[in-house]
Amino acid sequence: MEIIWWGSIVHTIMSVSEVEKEFRPSNLQSGLNFEKHVEKLYIGLGYSVSTTPITGDFGVDLLATSNTEKIAIQCKKYATPVGPDAVMQVYSGGAYYGCTRFSVFSVNGFTNAATEMASKLRVELFNIKLAV
């Protein structure tokens, strides 16, 4: 399995094998399961993580908080690459929640437009390549 990070996570507490185990396709049957595994990843990195309401979440699925930062996270388990709407949503929703960082996770990559927008807005894009 390959994990490609288009952002930067400074501290790594979970080993690569632990991350690979979390992101096996059998563990990610639904978008909600994908969110739960991303949540576990951030908890492993030492963050306190809370979920937002399923509806009316302002484009943010998870909020990861440490002593120094608050991260807005959106998780997309799409069959196709994620577009710029997800980047706009997590950025604006994160501002609503008072976040200092913004991240979008995908299992099928990102469009060029999403990557370009994320670069301008400083939104981190994380593409999880699942082992088959």
Q: What annotation goes with each model-predicted range?
A:
Residues 1-132:
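Mixed-charge (Asp/Glu-Lys/Arg
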